[in-house]
Amino acid sequence: MAILGLGTDIVEIARIEAVIARSGDRLARRVLSDNEWAIWKTHHQPVRFLAKRFAVKEAAAKAFGTGIRNGLAFNQFEVFNDELGKPRLRLWGEALKLAEKLGVVNMHVTLADERHYACATVIIES
């Protein structure tokens, strides 16, 4: 396997909190997949949950070398946890088509958060 891309992002949690206070759930609707949305609505720390998902999706877009444009959308990158709790990525729509075109066979996700920040790194392999 070969590394196709690496992306990292850091999010200030207070910034996400301010956006939610200003515009309600609009950011969450734009960023989260349907499955993530269902979790977010009942999560005990919704701001932190959204900040971490946003960081992973930004990191993934950077790893793919595209950013969020040309038909790609945040909600096409879905973050979920495997049976051991490890964060993973599931792709939908244009993100899935791009991964298939690039020959992506594996995606690695790491996620960390502290009081003020959430950060994520994504590595994609062919």
Curated annotation (Swiss-Prot):
It is found in: Cytoplasm. The lineage of its organism: Bacteria, Pseudomonadati, Pseudomonadota, Gammaproteobacteria, Enterobacterales. NCBIfam families: acpS (TIGR00516), pantethn_trn (TIGR00556). The keyword Cytoplasm applies. It catalyses: apo-[ACP] + CoA = holo-[ACP] + adenosine 3',5'-bisphosphate + H(+). One of its GO terms (molecular function) is magnesium ion binding. Its EC number is 2.7.8.7. Transfers the 4'-phosphopantetheine moiety from coenzyme A to a Ser of acyl-carrier-protein. Mg(2+) binds at D9, E58. It holds the Pfam family ACPS. It comes from Escherichia coli (strain ATCC 8739 / DSM 1576 / NBRC 3972 / NCIMB 8545 / WDCM 00012 / Crooks). Its cofactor is Mg(2+). It is an enzyme of class 2 (transferase). Its main location: cytoplasm. Keywords: Cytoplasm, Fatty acid biosynthesis, Fatty acid metabolism, Lipid biosynthesis, Lipid metabolism, Magnesium, Metal-binding, Transferase. Belongs to the P-Pant transferase superfamily. AcpS family. This is Holo-[acyl-carrier-protein] synthase. One of its GO terms (cellular component) is cytoplasm. GO terms for biological process: fatty acid biosynthetic process. InterPro entries: 4-PPantetheinyl_Trfase_dom (IPR008278), 4-PPantetheinyl_Trfase_dom_sf (IPR037143), ACPS (IPR002582), Ppantetheine-prot_Trfase_dom (IPR004568).
